[in-house]
Amino acid sequence: MKWVESEWTVPNAFPPPGAIPGVWYSASTWIGIDGDGSPDVLQAGCDSDVMNFIFGTMRQLNPWWEWFPEGTFWISNFPVSQGDTMSCLICVDEGSNTSARIYLMNDTNGAHASFAVTAPSGTTLEGNCAEWILESLEIDTSVPELASYGAMYFDACNSGTTDNTFLNAGNANTMNMLDSNGNVISEGAIENQTLVRCTYEGPLP
């Protein structure tokens, strides 16, 4: 894979049924290259976190990018709210598997950011897949439980290969998120050639 793009609406995350007060829950939306069957992931998106506490509910939204196995880079001065429309394009530099560019935009308020990024030492991009993902974001080896998010959609799910083959969601396979008992808590579905739906199917145990 050489590039991947999409746009999506930032979900309104809620604590799942049985949520523990004082514990953060996450619904992170992102697109990327690699990760399924490869040790690297080049990715960017927005993390939606939510926590119940004694005085109510606290939320935070943080745009980010990451070239795993290096850690997450949080993007500052990039305002985002639930319900905003985000768009992202990730492009590998021509003839390279260690450098790329990331373009992230909040189409609702006009905020935008771009980054020229370099692979972590010893890492190369395999380019074996493009991804459109909703999950609980792993942050520095810590993985919060999944927040309840209802349903959300990735639109304009397009990608391309180094030999200029154009691909989209119609060429993709779906993967579901399971709890520790094997129950589906987040389900993916391909709605059409460029539209992917993610649906919360909790609650968590």
Language model features by range: what are they?
Residues M1-P205:
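Exposed, interaction-prone regions of secreted/extracellular proteins
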